[in-house]
């Protein structure tokens, strides 16, 4: 994978009165395939480690794009890929778009536990013989921030270069926290004056991780944290559909953030909405 593809600067577009950072337009695998900032992070990680391993292993929710992202990346670098799931059945996996897409990219799917909890699956992954023999590398939820912090955060921060120098509101979906950390570090690095950063959480509380990591880089700052994850009735697995000016937002992430934005009182003309990625269509 050449450097130009890995570091492509995605555009900022004005659509129906609001600015969007279009990380969903990072599509090195082609239209409709896995895409976005999380794919770039995974590809940069595997670009760094692929000469030392024969394959990769990941474990995640049956609804998470991490499985097909990891599988597609492994295929691009000529590596094997194994995906560990838990708490499901083979017939269920054959019906769900993310496992199906991972299999289409060549992943070996294993139902490794009765529970789908990430800590249980990670425990099992660590004890795989190929992992113990250092033939396979485990790609974690959050794409291995602790081991490869500089390269991953630097890649996200670099995407801040082309946003406007002055912004009233930046709205960003927050899951694992890596994209949020990288974007906030980029605001400091590229001297962007963003008056209000709104992190809209679709996962567990990452504020401690975000602040501690940014402090190491001298880039810590205040932000508004909006917790959807613990809101009554919220479900990560339940899709929500939203379209803005022809942009179909990811039903598990940005679509839910857009629903929050619609009720927030923020004005579109004062806001940049960061899209981390789009739902891949190839697995449907």
Language model region names:
Residues 224-269, 275-279:
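Active-site-adjacent helical/loop segments in soluble small-molecule enzymes
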Residues 88-166, 224-248:
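Small/polar-residue-rich loop-to-helix segments that shape phosphate-bearing ligand pockets
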Residues 52-71, 77-86, 169-176:
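A short, small-residue-rich loop immediately preceding and capping a beta-strand
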């Amino acid at each position: 994978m050449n450097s130009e593809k890995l570091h492509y600067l995605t555009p900022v577009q004005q659509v129906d009165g609001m600015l969007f950072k279009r990380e969903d337009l990072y599509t090195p695998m082609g239209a409709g395939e896995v895409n976005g900032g999380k794919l770039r992070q995974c590809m940069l990680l595997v670009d760094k480690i692929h000469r030392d391993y024969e394959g990769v292993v990941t474990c995640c929710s049956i609804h998470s794009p991490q499985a097909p992202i990891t599988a597609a990346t492994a295929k691009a670098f000529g590596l094997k890929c194994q995906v560990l799931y838990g708490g499901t059945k083979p017939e269920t996996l054959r019906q769900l778009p993310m496992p199906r897409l991972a299999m289409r990219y060549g992943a070996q799917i294993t139902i490794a536990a009765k529970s789908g909890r990430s800590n249980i699956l990670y425990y099992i992954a660590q004890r795989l013989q190929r992992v113990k023999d250092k033939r396979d590398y485990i790609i974690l939820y959050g794409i291995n921030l602790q081991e490869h912090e500089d390269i991953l955060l630097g890649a996200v921060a670099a995407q801040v270069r082309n946003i406007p120098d002055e912004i009233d509101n930046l709205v960003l979906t927050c899951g694992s926290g890596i994209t949020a950390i990288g974007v906030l570090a980029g605001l400091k690095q590229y001297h962007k004056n963003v008056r209000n950063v709104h992190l809209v959480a679709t996962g567990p509380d990452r504020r401690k991780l975000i602040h501690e990591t940014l402090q190491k880089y001298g880039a810590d700052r205040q932000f508004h944290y909006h917790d959807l994850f613990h809101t009554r009735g919220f479900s990560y697995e339940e899709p929500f559909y939203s379209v803005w000016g022809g942009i179909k937002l990811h039903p598990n992430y940005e679509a839910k953030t857009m629903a929050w934005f619609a009720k927030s009182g923020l004005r579109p003309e004062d806001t940049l909405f960061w899209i981390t990625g789009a739902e891949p269509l190839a697995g449907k």
